[in-house]
Amino acid sequence: MIPVVALVGRPNVGKSTLFNRLTRTRDALVADFPGLTRDRKYGRAHLAGYEFIVVDTGGIDGTEEGIETRMAEQSLAAIEEADVVLFLTDARAGLTAADLAIAQHLRSREKTTFVVANKVDGIDADSACAEFWSLGLGEVYQMAAAQGRGVTNMIEYSLAPYAEAMGIVKQEDGDDDEEEREFTEEEAEAEQKRLQDLPIKLAIIGKPNVGKSTLTNRILGEERVVVYDEPGTTRDSIYIPMERQGREYVLIDTAGVRRRSKVHETVEKFSVIKTLKAVEDSNVVLLVIDAREGIAEQDLGLLGFVLNAGRALVIAVNKWDGIDQNVKDRVKTELDRRLGFIDFARIHFISALHGTGVGHLFESIEEAYDSATRRVSTSMLTRIMQMSQDDHQPPLVNGRRVKLKYAHAGGYNPPIVVVHGNQVKKLPDSYKRYMMNYFRRSLKVIGTPIQLRFQEGGNPFEGLNTKKLTVSQERRRKRMVGHIRDKNKD
């Protein structure tokens, strides 16, 4: 399971700066749910050989009045559900009453916590950080998030114990930037073979009360207990093995666990972190939407995270029975308008309560998974790449035409196509989108996003046949070239 790292601290200690650096800024806001998360942000990070979800909890300005009264409920939830807490302090401002209050709360929760003294650039760091040892949370790590100094080491120190305990293998590829990482055809082949031997992991997600539990029970064909009061039950999703028509699945049920803080509270408690972890651990995501409410901002936020995670996707519009035809037409129009950016995903209109349309979901789930894991040869990908060039040439960059040489598979689930050539890193985003759509149409990819990676370099097969032509072969070649030229003149 992918670890979750929560950034905690009072305002203006550098949490947002660290968050943007960890998530590389360009895809920092992968899941921002207005009205639900308030000042909390979620992002995917890859650093020091580890992949993890990072959560910016927002600032805590409470001091002597008590941490519980000043910390937002969502920030409390982030601490509860995080695997590792990074407690950021300001080395220049020194220890404050707010820092002491936060430390007291963290000690009471017994969370794995690391104290990080930020903004150590340009000062005597050791002297400035000495007082933070009095927080009683162990070693104090020095960092300058704005300059990036100490960030990688801090992540490695904080995640290594958790990774060792959970059996997570550190990636030793030496490159933490997904865009710069070398994707090899051999690795893709191994990944494709590995996926063929595993059951399909299906995550059922959606905002509260859209019918996820009802749909899960309908799929399983049995009633399941969905309310638990034992400590820790809100932490992780439930994994349910099942088999359907000879194919093995693992349902990742994010709605099967609820928490009742009060006896009369029956509304499902929505855990964003639990949902995001389920998405990361899945092969296919089934997003459930309430037909009566239409597309909500939370739905769009979840879709953003699914796309960034590269997971195959099927959409189920639930509670379709019993609504008027004019309402159905309005919902379909809204879906077309607001979900145009995921036109590759199948949309089903179902009733989980009565079972209408539920059986057809698995046809699309299998189709999406097969598209995400189907092996494609280098020759086919290179041919499609050449066809895309013939239809629309790459633009000029600094007066020179970008030259695309060959393409190969770089991974599966999601399908990754690696394009090699000269100046490919300078291709404009518009041409990259054109190529991505061209590959999607040509490969008939349904139900899964497709990713393109561009790498500088020549054809690996160049120079293999360096044997010099004989005199007779050279003469024959000249005659052939002359014949072709004469034919073209005619």
Curated annotation (Swiss-Prot):
Domain KH-like: start-end pairs: 374-458
For this entry, the protein name equals: GTPase Der
Q: What is the recorded function of this protein according to its Swiss-Prot or TrEMBL entry?
A: GTPase that plays an essential role in the late steps of ribosome biogenesis.
Q: How does it assemble?
A: Associates with the 50S ribosomal subunit.
Q: What organism does the record attribute this protein to?
A: Shewanella halifaxensis (strain HAW-EB4)
Which protein family is it in?
Belongs to the TRAFAC class TrmE-Era-EngA-EngB-Septin-like GTPase superfamily. EngA (Der) GTPase family.
CDD domains assigned to the protein according to its UniProt record, in alphabetical order: EngA1 (cd01894), EngA2 (cd01895)
**Coiled-coil zones:** none
Matching Pfam families: KH_dom-like, MMR_HSR1
**Residues noted as binding GTP 1 in the record, renumbered to the chain:** 9-16, 56-60, 118-121
